[in-house]
Amino acid sequence: MFRDGLRQLIDREPDLVVCGDAATADEAMRGIGETRPDLVIVDISLAGASGTDLIKGIKSQHEDLPMLVVSMHDESLYAERALRAGAMGYVMKQEPAKTVKSAIRKVLAGDMHLSEKLASSLVSRFMHGAPDQPARPIETLSDRELVVFRMLGQGKGTRQIAAEMEVTVATINSFRNRIKEKLNLKTSTELMLHAIQWVQGEASR
């Protein structure tokens, strides 16, 4: 649904056109190879993959292709990960249409797009040095662990997550154990409740 809305928003602009879209990372990589776009818009939430993994994959094969992340997820947690992976901008879906269009044009022109809040945070971290410990325990999770945590919070079971991520159940169980350790959660029930609460909090932003 969001892809359709974004397509309509872009296609209404006389100087912009959508040459394709994709629901999965594999579809995206194939489409990029076939259409050779000037810009790729990435959502952090992908079926069976991390958006940051896709960004890294695109960067490895198309080094000069600019990427903009448009996501519902809190920029304070995801934006720096996306930028480190190779994205040139991050804008939240809740932003006005004019902000999204401005971000697209800035990244197309070779500039970075960051919100004032995010830019200020990054400058502060650079000037004063990154803290020894992440501000929130959730920030200690790796990209893949964060994907698993989000899927758990969406009510998906271990087997479903394994199928969507195309890994074994044992791998997902390993992720679950590492997440519990990093978040100081003792039981699987605590993990599920914590994940659900976090996903609901993200949705209400």
Short names for language-model regions:
Residues 43, 71:
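Active-site residues of response regulator receiver
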Residues 52-64:
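Short amphipathic alpha-helix used as the core "switch/output" element in two-component signaling
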Residues 77-84, 89-143, 147, 189, ...:
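Short, flexible helix-to-coil linker/hinge segments that flank and couple to helix-turn-helix
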Residues 177-205:
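Basic, Lys/Arg-enriched C-terminal extension of HTH/homeodomain DNA-binding domains
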